[in-house]
């Protein structure tokens, strides 16, 4: 049986999670979960955090922090501020990664985290050394599973089937066998299940 998680400084760790949640609670976009409307990025952060801990109960402090701030204040840089092209999308995503990492680093430094921890969290935010870094793989697995469980239905409803299948295939390629097994256990609607089956057969 593994030892209970013990952060280097419990008060500092809890303060960091609170700060991340406070920032994400400002999201003007709402999403309903269990019948309650919640700030979208706050809900996303908690779902990602939960999935990381289910995949890796012994997750390190930097990985736990990274899971909680991966999309920190994402709404502040709108997709519409970049060209509505593939190149524009990629530029937007690259900018967001740096933005999240910078904001997370600012908060962690303010709370007194040492630079090695700050840099480690930012490296995870930026998904550096993927797929060689085991913790980055856990984070990517969790990101893919949150997408499949909570975002696939919305994407499938708004996007052409071939594009959704392409997104599914890209996610599947990045996932470990453990995450793929978890993905197959998720409850999908008939349309989403059919798309996933097509993606895996292609």
Segment roles from a protein language model:
Residues 2-18, 22, 35-42, 46, ...:
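Divalent metal-dependent phosphate-bond-processing catalytic cores, especially two-metal-ion Mg2+/Mn2+ enzymes
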Residues 22-31, 83-84:
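Short, charged, low-complexity loops and linkers
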Residues 32-36, 87-93, 134:
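A ubiquitous short alpha-helical element
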Residues 61-80, 100, 104, 123-129, ...:
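His-Asp-centered metal-binding catalytic motifs of divalent-metal-dependent phosphohydrolases/nucleases
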Residues 66, 81, 86-94, 192-202:
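Long, low-complexity, intrinsically disordered polar/charged segments
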Residues 71-78, 91-95, 119, 138-142:
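Membrane-targeting and insertion segments and their boundary/processing signals
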Residues 80-123:
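Helix-adjacent hinge/juxtasegments
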């Amino acid at each position: 049986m593994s030892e209970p998680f013990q952060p280097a400084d419990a008060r500092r760790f809890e303060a960091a999670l609170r700060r991340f949640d406070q920032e994400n609670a400002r999201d003007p976009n709402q999403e309903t979960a269990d019948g309650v409307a919640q700030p979208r990025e706050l809900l996303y952060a908690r779902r990602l955090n939960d999935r990381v801990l289910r995949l890796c109960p012994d997750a390190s402090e930097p990985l736990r922090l990274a899971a909680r701030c991966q999309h920190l204040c994402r709404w502040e840089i709108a997709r519409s501020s970049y060209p509505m092209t593939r190149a524009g999308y990629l530029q937007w995503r690259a900018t967001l990664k740096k933005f999240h990492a910078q904001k997370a680093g600012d908060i962690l430094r303010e709370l007194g985290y040492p630079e090695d921890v700050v840099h480690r969290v930012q490296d995870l935010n930026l998904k550096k050394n993927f797929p060689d870094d085991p913790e980055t793989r856990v984070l990517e697995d969790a990101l893919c599973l949150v997408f499949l469980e909570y975002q696939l239905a919305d994407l499938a409803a708004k996007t052409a089937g071939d594009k959704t299948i392409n997104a599914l295939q890209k996610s599947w390629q990045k996932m470990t066998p453990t995450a793929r097994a978890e993905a197959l256990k998720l409850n999908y609607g008939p349309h989403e299940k059919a798309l996933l089956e097509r993606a895996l057969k292609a």
